[in-house]
């Protein structure tokens, strides 16, 4: 559990700016953000032209730099060394591997952002979840928001959460697990992991949301 310390400051009379003598609130997080170990896995280039790159991101590699200054090793920085000027138009979670589209020009960034925003680009994920998921297809609609005391986790919140929709299709059922194909209609952080956990079938291998 992470704690938060709240402090209050006053401006003293005679200070350089003595006009505002009301208390000022601010929040200090006493624990540093999570440090991501350096990943040795290479990035596979699947396609390249003058407008964009299509790459296969390995697991345990950030898509973009993390909040902590030491979390600088990421897919975007690695690609920028060889293809200067690349930018990020979407992300995959640290523990997720898969195909990413990386624009090389401002025009490509703008067009891809428009396509993602208007949901013209379909995203599909495969995962192994705990238990026997039933029925064969379904939809999860649970709003999500940040879990501030436990960042970077997210949580379900029906009062302030943003709408989040995930559809699933069962690919194979095994003794104690199910392989599913997931279709995120929205793209909230950790959406798939939280949605599967909330219906009682957490994604196996997920350190944040799957029970041990």
Show which residues each predicted segment covers.
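RNA pseudouridine synthases
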Residues: 1-165, 171-175, 196
